[in-house]
């Protein structure tokens, strides 16, 4: 990462010419899933601060809110700010009130849905073209070739620049890439989530596909450890994840303590160490830690010494 007071370095994401900051900003927690939505003026200020600090990749999805996170970014990117960023959003997960009440979600990847979702995101973001458009989850009922075929048409129509996949298998990535170049695959990758290293990471690298690592701080646990749970509201879905349950918490607490010990030796914070590990995986990897606080963003952008 860049030293304090300098701009964030750039990396090539994929093989189609997309260039982004070596670290992006995940915007989900500003509007959804990690407790109640945060005050809009504060989040717009945070987004502007990130951009002014050199971050160019902003990540959202139509399911965050749902919809309100895209609307927030649309407001934040007024007044010439849009031209300074690469805006990534996603489609495919439907989480209406009735689904939310049942703790369920639907996944859609049929052509009509893809097109309608794209048009709706363009409207909410108040833009003419989405820079990077991911299929958020793969619809197993629809061949990936059909979904990507529709995305390809949207690229040809100028509504999308680049196509991505999120949480896709290695075989699905190959099949999709054969229809239209996939620029990036988004996946969970961190010190405590490494299952993607066996097949998916090698496949992306073989095909020249960029890697966007979400939850590089272990959904906040690698920053705060067990105390993260103390202030969680009932609206915070992390409260119900297996890794945060009592039967797993002791092992994860031990992992966090080891990270803290290493961070002390390095002269950095646990979150800086965790991010340094992700950056060290290669210059084709862009982590997108999320935050709702400017002080956390500043900390996340400082390098871990000797990282």
UniProtKB/Swiss-Prot annotation:
The active site is at 64 (proton donor). One of its GO terms (biological process) is auxin-activated signaling pathway. Substrate binds at residue 136. SUPFAM superfamilies: NAD(P)-linked oxidoreductase (SSF51430). GO terms for cellular component: cytoplasm. InterPro entries: Aldo-Keto_reductase, NADP_OxRdtase_dom, NADP_OxRdtase_dom_sf. GO terms for molecular function: aldo-keto reductase (NADPH) activity. Keywords: Auxin signaling pathway, NADP, Oxidoreductase. Induction: By auxin. The record marks 90 as: Lowers pKa of active site Tyr. Disulfide bonds: none annotated. NADP(+) binds at residues 215-225. Belongs to the aldo/keto reductase family. Aldo/keto reductase 2 subfamily. This is Auxin-induced protein PCNT115. It comes from Nicotiana tabacum.
